[in-house]
């Protein structure tokens, strides 16, 4: 596993632990299907959150992080979320949200949360 991949995995674990510490229940990590992959599925309060974790080693973020997940990636996440819900019918009536966690390296080489964008995009995939 190369350094970038290792950091991305470390970032996903860190975000899952961070959300769990806030009372979230992590239902799935790196859930894969024919439509793609969902980094994290977390029940946070009464909301089912599909979380995309974006990790960058430096300060290579746009000003608000909005460019981290483009329209193509949004459509893939929407398809993957629909397939996740089909595979878990007990969750099908959940209120769902698509969140993006922007993660960077701290000066010591560890993980730091740059931004957590709850409701980063709507279910339309635009």
UniProtKB/Swiss-Prot annotation:
<dbReference type="GO" id="GO:0003676">
    <property type="term" value="F:nucleic acid binding"/>
</dbReference>
<dbReference type="InterPro" id="IPR011856">
    <property type="entry name" value="tRNA_endonuc-like_dom_sf"/>
</dbReference>
<protein>
    <recommendedName>
        <fullName>UPF0102 protein gll3754</fullName>
    </recommendedName>
</protein>
<dbReference type="InterPro" id="IPR003509">
    <property type="entry name" value="UPF0102_YraN-like"/>
</dbReference>
<comment type="similarity">
    <text>Belongs to the UPF0102 family.</text>
</comment>
<dbReference type="InterPro" id="IPR011335">
    <property type="entry name" value="Restrct_endonuc-II-like"/>
</dbReference>
<dbReference type="Pfam" id="PF02021">
    <property type="entry name" value="UPF0102"/>
</dbReference>
